[in-house]
Amino acid sequence: MTALTKLFHKLLLLEVFFMENKTQTSNHQHQSKWTLRNIILIALIAIFCGIIFWGIGFLYTALTVALTPIGAAPFANDILMGLWCMAGPLTGFLIRTAGSAFLGEFLGAAVEVFLGGQWGAGAFISGLVQGVGSELGFTLTGYKRYDWVSLNASILTTVIVTFAWDMYKNGYNKFALPLLIGLFVTRYISTFIFGGILTKMIVKLLDRSNAFSL
């Protein structure tokens, strides 16, 4: 993850090089208008996360194989869900514009598709569902604050929406209640770590390096 974070840092430095004017925002401000700078940054995040999504496919396969002998194969999906959903919170927290969390997640999934991800075009649907889940969290706070409150709201709505989708898509509705609870808690922890803690770490890294003014 360190190498990927450095890559993202370099991409942002390129973005800053081409965009001279910066807009200062605080933890409780948002940008109401779309700018070329926002679009470029979303594209960079989508590429960064799309590469991660593509790589997770291999990790998912290996983890599923490892967990199958102990009857815990379904947990592979939920253990890695936070990584699959990190583009939404990261984009929403950096761009701070309505719709940015959804676009970041969906476009990240699109990059995964074009890289030849193992789920093919089905990743578009997953990206759409995950994007909606992430966006809802920022909607609940009215796009008026960007701190742990909005980030946790995004994490919670992402977990709820994606879990509801998996009840239909992956047959979670056939699982026993104790297993469902275990999967839900696992998904929440994963999303909190990668969509919450890692997002804040990346934001702080960029803030310290002055690559992006927050």
Q: Regions from the language model: what does each represent?
A:
Residues 39-44, 82, 86, 102-103, ...:
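Hydrophobic alpha-helical transmembrane segments
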Residues 154-214:
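Terminal transmembrane helical module of multi-pass membrane proteins
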Residues 45-53, 87-88, 108, 112, ...:
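Alpha-helical transmembrane segments of multipass membrane proteins
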Residues 57, 108-136, 169:
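Interfacial aromatic-anchored transmembrane helix boundaries in multi-pass membrane proteins
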Residues 21-23, 38-46, 125-166:
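Short helix-perturbing small/polar motifs within transmembrane alpha-helices
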